[in-house]
């Protein structure tokens, strides 16, 4: 594809400590603010690509732990994705690149485990709800956004709703 994925990284001082905000570590239980990314926004607006014209802000499911049942966690995640969608739109990006790969070091977003305190059926319903909230937040900021993913279809197929077949599959809750 004739495009490029751009990772946005910013940092600021909070209570005497340097805190970093990175688009590939977007699943955080903290609501990011637009002004945190002012420098990146200005830089991206200044770009005038002639050859690489389909550019995407890179995101990743890598930062855990994830909690499907925490309303505050998902409000923050949706806020952060809406913010990245807004920045993508305002800076002429085509959209967001979603890295959904199962990195073993952080706990995977779409994994099901009975340890989460819910049945597979309840967890799947909650994941669907969170998916709707997520896409609504993104769509509100950038209605005609392009979402690009490396593994979108291959993660979901083949899937089974038979809990005995799921085990610890990393994509059991993938919508």
What positions do the PLM features span?
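Glycan-processing catalytic domains of CAZymes
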Residues: 1-175
């Amino acid at each position: 594809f004739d495009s490029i994925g751009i990772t946005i990284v910013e940092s600021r001082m909070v209570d005497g400590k340097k805190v970093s905000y990175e688009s590939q570590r977007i699943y955080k239980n903290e609501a990011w603010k637009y002004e945190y990314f002012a420098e990146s926004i200005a830089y991206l607006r200044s770009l005038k690509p002639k050859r690489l014209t389909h550019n995407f802000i890179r995101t990743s499911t890598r930062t855990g732990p994830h909690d499907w049942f925490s309303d505050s966690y998902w409000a923050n995640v949706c806020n952060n994705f809406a913010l990245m969608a807004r920045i993508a739109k305002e800076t002429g990006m085509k959209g967001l690149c979603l890295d959904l790969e199962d990195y073993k070091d952080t706990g995977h977003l779409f994994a099901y485990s009975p340890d989460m305190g819910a049945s597979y059926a309840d967890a799947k319903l909650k994941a669907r709800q969170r998916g709707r909230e997520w896409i609504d937040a993104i769509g509100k900021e950038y209605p005609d956004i392009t979402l690009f993913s490396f593994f979108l279809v291959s993660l979901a197929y083949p899937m089974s709703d038979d809990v005995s077949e799921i085990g610890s599959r990393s994509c059991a809750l993938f919508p």
